[in-house]
Amino acid sequence: MFLEAVYHRPRKNWSYAYNGTTVHLRIRTKKDDMTAVYALAGDKYMWDHTMEYVPMTKLATDELFDYWECEVTPPYRRVKYGFLLQQGHEKRWMTEYDFLTEPPRNPDRLFEYPFINPVDVFQPPAWVKDAIFYQIFPERFANGDTRNDPEGTLPWGSADPTPSCFFGGDLQGVIDHLDHLSKLGVNAVYFTPLFKATTNHKYDTEDYFQIDPQFGDKDTLKKLVDLCHERGIRVLLDAVFNHSGRTFPPFVDVLKNGEKSKYKDWFHIRSLPLEVVDGIPTYDTFAFEPLMPKLNTEHPDVKEYLLKAAEYWIRETGIDGWRLDVANEVSHQFWREFRRVVKQANPDAYILGEVWHESSIWLEGDQFDAVMNYPFTNAVLDFFIHQIADAEKFSFMLGKQLAGYPRQASEVMFNLLDSHDTARLLTQADGDKRKMKLAVLFQFTYFGTPCIYYGDEVGLDGGHDPGCRKCMEWDETKHDKDLFAFYQTVIRLRQAHAALRTGTFKFLTAEKNSRQIAYLREDDQDTILVVMNNDKAGHTLRCLSGMHSGPICGTTMS
């Protein structure tokens, strides 16, 4: 046994309450080192009568390690536990202090989950597990009211998008096309920012309490939210709390009054006057963008202002949650207070952070419910679209992430394949719809909440920003009807089978130098086998004996 690789800690993703009665236990071992792993678990006050060996299953594997998991339901909501590691006939018992060659005589030195306190259980909104999101960039979705068009608005779709052009998209345009969303089958919408700003993307907020007049007003948003709710569609708005815009009145005051401004501590200012020297602003910003000064969210007045805005739009319009821009650059303390305020306003609100990398520190139940799952995006693109990862590497990329988060976080992770910040999926696939369909099929049959970027379903293409922000095509003769029907099919498939949303996931085939995968999604009602060939040539796969016990074991698939 390679005991140096064995790892467990009684916290985070290794030992956590999945709900009010169940604890999930995980342990890491060297890849292919153990033939079996068990948790020995029981009540410390009734150890002799309650201790049992619980078999652990292999949750995931990466290049170096296997990750094992089991579920225990302690009758009194507390559990003492250790692990039995087995390599053939060799056995080791792992306690909190050491490895033993014999079973521990008493539970004193075992690990402990002291008590499942309901208030401490990380519980994302249940509805998100069943959600299928559709992302809308409002300025480019539909122009429903030409009276609010900004000066210089171009005719719809008459030119390629630029960083500064406007086409007149607005909230009324979304209202006018809700039938399209219902026909597609989505049940949640995420809007990029709607609040008053100078740009077409609105990530430079001027007023956090006003809908940009270009899009409509608060009443229009309220009408849109109500109409969406009537159709069973949830609504998520974008909050830009890392930075404001240059026209944000407190920043304008600092520009005007400098050291005398009562708002100078609302921002991270290194020197006055505010200026840009050799391309670097004298104040902190998003990236080095002078139009986006970074907010000091530790300042009590800033904190109060932003938290009031977060609560205001939930109470005034009934939105179902927030997506948080540049969330990883804002303090954890602020996000903890944000969660408290938002969940008080709507306990069922979904809090989604924009974090592009490993995110476990935000997913412990005190900050976000989920993050935008770009590591998932990268894995899917590497395997299906760019074909720079083989099946084994693909499974490793996903396995490492799956083992890194508690299950309830994985169930609501925001799984996207493209967005307003990336090239469109069809463009990345070089127009190959076969690749695109495989990627989408995996997205809809994997853990997490899938999101469709507006227009993907009708064949919209486009490179990186601003190319990915084209006007939505509303001429149905130009729609890719085959692609639209495919999206409808995978949406119906996911909605019809709970196993695809919350069931277990297991790769059956994901081999080195292979472009074929097979995996199972399984719950008490369904066992769903998914087989994909990401190669132009045909292949035959066989489910190996012992990989799964059931009717499909030993099946040959061509």
Curated annotation (Swiss-Prot):
Ca(2+) binds at N143, G168, D170. Optimum pH for hydrolysis of beta-cyclodextrin is approximately 7.5. Optimum pH for hydrolysis of soluble starch is 6.0 and 6.0-7.0 for hydrolysis of pullulan. Keywords: Calcium, Carbohydrate metabolism, Glycosidase, Hydrolase, Metal-binding. InterPro entries: Glyco_hydro_13_cat_dom (IPR006047), Glyco_hydro_13_lg-like_dom (IPR004185), Glyco_hydro_b (IPR013780), Glycoside_hydrolase_SF (IPR017853), Ig-like_fold (IPR013783), Malt_amylase-like_C (IPR032091), O16G_dom_2 (IPR045857). Its cofactor is Ca(2+). The keyword Hydrolase applies. Optimum temperature is 50 degrees Celsius for hydrolysis of beta-cyclodextrin. It is elevated from 40 to 50 degrees Celsius by addition of Ca(2+), and the thermal activity is retained more than 80% at 60 degrees Celsius in the presence of Ca(2+). The optimum temperature is between 40-50 degrees Celsius for hydrolysis of soluble starch, and it is 50 degrees Celsius for hydrolysis of pullulan. It is an enzyme of class 3 (hydrolase). Transmembrane segments: none annotated. The active site is at D325, E354. Cyclomaltodextrins form inclusion complexes with many water-insoluble compounds that have applications in the food and drug industries. The capability of this enzyme to hydrolyze cyclomaltodextrins is of importance for the release of substances from these inclusion complexes. This enzyme can be used to modify rice starch structure to produce starch, which has a decreased amylose content, or it could be used to produce starch, which is free of amylose altogether. Cooked rice treated with this enzyme has a significantly slower retrogradation. Its EC number is 3.2.1.135, 3.2.1.54. It catalyses: cyclomaltodextrin + H2O = linear maltodextrin; Hydrolysis of pullulan to panose (6-alpha-D-glucosylmaltose). One of its GO terms (molecular function) is calcium ion binding. Binds 1 Ca(2+) ion per subunit. The record marks D421 as: Transition state stabilizer. The keyword Calcium applies. Hydrolyzes alpha-, beta- and gamma-cyclodextrins and the resulting linear maltodextrins, with the highest activity with beta-cyclodextrin (cyclomaltoheptaose). Soluble starch is hydrolyzed slowly, but it is nevertheless preferred over pullulan as a substrate. Is able to hydrolyze amylose and amylopectin, with a very strong preference for amylose, with maltose and glucose as the main products. Maltose and glucose are the main hydrolysis products of cyclomaltodextrins, maltodextrins and starch, whereas panose is the main hydrolysis product of pullulan. Monomer. Depending on the pH of the solution, exists as a monomer, a homodimer or as an assembly of six homodimers forming a dodecamer, which is catalytically the most efficient form of the enzyme. This is Cyclomaltodextrinase. It comes from Bacillus sp. The lineage of its organism: Bacteria, Bacillati, Bacillota, Bacilli, Bacillales.
